[in-house]
Amino acid sequence: MKFISKVHGEITYDEKNIIIFNKGILGFDELKRFILIELEEYEPFKLLHSLEDDGVGLIVTSPYDFFEDYELKLSEDIINNLKIEMPKDVMVITTITLNSEAKKITTNLQGPIIINISNNLGEQIILDNSKYKIKQPLIGE
């Protein structure tokens, strides 16, 4: 299937790769269907793009690529909502805020996006743990 993004142009995807966010994503509660696109020339970053709004695409990454000690505990509600059966089925990504100055690029470690890769259900959660920041610099000083 094909989708035209305002920013990224034509995107080809397979319908089986559509990720459903029943609760939407923070700031985009009404948008439920997204695809995750590899950005090979910009590894380890990916594009999480809405299929319902051609202007909504979020740059995301695995927090573990930058913060090896990042940890979170999923609540029973999240495990049930996403129908998670095995830890290996869980993908964790965080949104990126870009900046022309590399030291000002940040990620939201307090609001990770959890995806069950076995059934393509996703949900953004808010961690109560105050040690993680909403705008955590990706690159140290």
Curated annotation (Swiss-Prot):
Keywords: Bacterial flagellum biogenesis, Chaperone, Cytoplasm, Translation regulation. It is found in: Cytoplasm. Its main location: cytoplasm. InterPro entries: Flagellar_assembly_factor_FliW, Flagellar_assmbl_FliW_dom_sf. GO terms for biological process: bacterial-type flagellum assembly; regulation of translation. SUPFAM superfamilies: BH3618-like (SSF141457). The keyword 4Fe-4S does not apply. The keyword S-adenosyl-L-methionine does not apply. One of its GO terms (cellular component) is cytoplasm. Belongs to the FliW family. Interacts with translational regulator CsrA and flagellin(s). This is Flagellar assembly factor FliW. The lineage of its organism: Bacteria, Bacillati, Bacillota, Clostridia, Eubacteriales.
